[in-house]
From Swiss-Prot:
It is found in: Cytoplasm. Component of the proteasome core, a large protease complex with broad specificity involved in protein degradation. The 20S proteasome core is composed of 14 alpha and 14 beta subunits that assemble into four stacked heptameric rings, resulting in a barrel-shaped structure. The two inner rings, each composed of seven catalytic beta subunits, are sandwiched by two outer rings, each composed of seven alpha subunits. The catalytic chamber with the active sites is on the inside of the barrel. Has a gated structure, the ends of the cylinder being occluded by the N-termini of the alpha-subunits. Is capped by the proteasome-associated ATPase, ARC. Pathway: Protein degradation; proteasomal Pup-dependent pathway. InterPro entries: Ntn_hydrolases_N, Proteasome_alpha, Proteasome_alpha-type, Proteasome_asu_bac, Proteasome_sua/b. The gene is prcA. The formation of the proteasomal ATPase ARC-20S proteasome complex, likely via the docking of the C-termini of ARC into the intersubunit pockets in the alpha-rings, may trigger opening of the gate for substrate entry. Interconversion between the open-gate and close-gate conformations leads to a dynamic regulation of the 20S proteasome proteolysis activity. Its main location: cytoplasm. GO terms for cellular component: cytoplasm; proteasome core complex, alpha-subunit complex. CDD domains: proteasome_protease_HslV. GO terms for molecular function: threonine-type endopeptidase activity. One of its GO terms (biological process) is modification-dependent protein catabolic process. This is Proteasome subunit alpha.
Length: 248
């Protein structure tokens, strides 16, 4: 006589967590950090079409690590939610905390009710409205719907520990854009070196996706930094004489 295969709820949750963590561990790393002008996003991403960083709404940005099709569905859903709420009420009613809570509820439901969890980790960031002085807000949302607000930076992807350790040592509040980019790139290199046996990889324009939420811009704060503008920032942060901030 055969017995039906039974898995306890605790074991099912453990297996789902392990599946999600393994998927995220294969992803390239993403860093989001607060700087003097807002929030900087830096991702290891050689693809120009499959983007990990995006605008969600006027003052809100999004970054993710994990399976692209899964976090892209979440990104598009977040944009639709924000547009609908901003149209029905007021644009200022759309906040980073609100969107982070929506993502947390969605991922929590998927984790507990669907056969397979999403293999994703998200960051939602918000800067103050133009003319206000409120500090940036950073929220981390994990595959099971857990949410945490981070005061300074968020690290996501496969090699978070060496990157987070590097940021803890080098992060400076109110850094310029050039300095913040240098801190983020150096931390990403520390993570890549940890997985490649100590060799320091080259992270340049072709292998980085960079964007900012610029609190000094009216209305739409999101801005991508690409091409020559990114190259100039990378050159500046490598130069000991660098004392200014480039724009792009």
């Amino acid at each position: 006589m055969s017995f039906p295969y039974f898995i306890s709820p605790e074991q099912a949750m453990r297996e789902r967590s392990e599946l999600a963590r393994k998927g995220i561990a294969r992803a390239k790393s993403v860093v989001a950090l607060a700087y003097a002008g807002g929030v900087l996003f830096v991702a290891e991403n050689p693809s120009r079409s499959l983007q990990k960083i995006s605008e969600l709404y006027d003052r809100v940005g999004f970054a993710a690590a994990g399976k692209f099709n899964e976090f892209d569905n979440l990104r598009r859903g977040g944009i639709q939610f924000a547009d609908t709420r901003g149209y029905a009420y007021d644009r200022r009613d759309v906040t980073g905390r609100q969107l982070a809570n929506v993502y947390a509820q969605t991922l929590g439901t998927i984790f507990t009710e669907q056969a397979k969890p999403y293999e994703v980790e998200l960051c939602v960031a918000e800067v103050a409205h133009y003319g206000e002085t409120k500090p940036p807000e950073l929220y981390r949302i994990t595959y099971d719907g857990s949410i945490a607000d981070e005061p300074h930076f968020v690290v996501m992807g496969g090699t978070t520990e060496p990157i987070a350790n590097a940021l803890k040592e080098s992060y400076a509040e109110n850094a310029s854009l050039t300095d913040a980019l240098g801190i983020a790139v150096a931390a990403l290199r520390a993570g890549s070196a940890d997985t490649s046996g100590g060799d320091q990889p080259t992270l340049g324009v072709a292998s980085l996706e960079v964007a900012v939420l610029d609190a000094n811009r009216p209305r739409r704060a999101f801005r991508r930094i690409t091409g020559s503008a990114l190259q100039a920032l990378l050159v500046d942060q490598e130069s000991p004489q660098s004392d200014g901030e480039s724009s792009g």
